[in-house]
């Protein structure tokens, strides 16, 4: 009888510790801006290059996925979309978003975006400037076609006051879109390096 009581007590202790640990586990969000339709280097796609990476990250971490979208969609044709995006960048515009996401309940946020002329898309700035990033861990990931990170990691450190910005994943959009196995392995390796 005494042995049963000890086993029951140990079991209850382990269950309690597990429940407390689960309650204390940080909430993670993958917030991504990506553009489908006609894209440079990959043709017309159903999912934008950065969205492809975002889904891999969400799948491998169990994080929730949120897509940052401009209220007014970009044109489907590549050169028309770049004309609009370049005009937004030149004006330092902050386009309205289709919807927003309350990030207050998240401790860790993976932030994905394509590099457009060496910078974040302007809709990403709209999202960033709408929130308090104090105490958040931000993990950037981006796609590009030759410009790499373009200093956007430093831009995020300046913009997201009070947050901790970790090492970015940087990948060519053509790799994300056309070499999914390679992309998935790169994402997994990067996440392991971050402790996920």
Language model: regions and residue ranges:
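Glycine-rich phosphate/pyrophosphate-binding loop and the adjoining helix
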Residues: 164-196
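Bacterial N-terminal signal peptides that target proteins for export
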Residues: 1-8
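Helix-loop-strand module that forms the ligand-binding subsite of alpha/beta enzymes
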Residues: 76-162
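Extracytoplasmic metal-acquisition and chelation regions
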Residues: 28-29, 151-174
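Hydrophobic/aromatic beta-strand patches that form the interior of the parallel beta-sheet core
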Residues: 31, 66, 110, 139-141, ...
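Bacterial N-terminal signal peptides
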Residues: 9-17
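N-terminal beta1-alpha1-beta2 submodule of the flavodoxin-like/Rossmannoid cofactor-binding fold
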Residues: 21-108, 118, 185-196
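Solvent-exposed loop/turn segments at secondary-structure junctions
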Residues: 35-38, 70-75, 115-119, 144-149, ...
